[in-house]
Amino acid sequence: MAGTGTPPREKTYVYRTGRPDRLCSLLFAVAALILCAGIGAVLWHEWQGTRPTAAEQAEADEIERADGSEEEIAAVTEEAANGKIVVAIDPGHGGVNPSVGSEDAGSLGSGLREADVTLKTATLVYDKLARDGRFAPMLTANGTEYLKPSRRAARAKAAGAQLLLSIHLNYDADSGVSGFECCPATPQLSTNADSLRFARLVAAKFGAMGMELRGIDGVRYIYFDDNDNRYIRESNDTTVLSDPTFTVVQKCGCPAVLVEEGFITNADDVALVATDAACEAAAQAYYECILTYFDLT
């Protein structure tokens, strides 16, 4: 019968929604990734900004090794808390240098070793300050243990030194070369003005003792270039340079002066600064300069 056959199949339309959904998910994931990357970059930048440089970390490590590990530093710090003035005395050279396997005697001349003379004078200065009662002196080295200049500076800094005096003797192959010079913190350092004031006191005192003053007044700035070559500027040259000076002077955290008392290779200089009597006279000169520097009598 007409019209009784199987009705025609209804057309079915299928809407494919899966592909747009996947696209939206992908875009969302990319956006989230970009956001996370941005946040990570900001955090990394901030961390790098607060992270110490290799040099800063090395200095911090030196201070950590010096601070709190030695009874002397603890004792000096305690005395400083009681109002005493901390003065660091640095005897140049001394001790066996493990890098070369031999003792760091410093310069040799006139039958003397620089390390012996500087330790003798430094110890005499220490004793005078200790007897005074207003000071808490410390030696950055004892002559038996080798300590790098950075470690010596770290010891002084850890003890809260308010002044550092580093004692040395000069050397020249020509025995006719002579004279006194001292080297304060350089103009680019915040400790320059006070270091220069102390250096001028010391130079004037040694000049009065009969020492020839090198340069214009016995006070000179010493710098080291990128190749570690030393060069000199006189004390009236206030040019701010980026090159470093002596490590013990630059890193101790207080006004500091490195003294080259005279030439160990010159007989006249040795007579004035390196004999037993001369070491006592030099120590007294330093003591008097320290009193003047701190306005004490």
What do the PLM-derived regions correspond to, one by one?
Residues 5-7, 20, 40-42, 51, ...:
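Compositionally biased, intrinsically disordered low-complexity regions
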Residues 10-11, 23, 55, 94, ...:
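A generic alpha-helix propensity feature with a strong bias for hydrophobic helices
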Residues 18-28, 41-60, 76-77, 116-297:
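Active-site-proximal helix/loop segments of hydrolytic enzymes
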Residues 78, 84-111:
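Short glycine-rich His-centered loop
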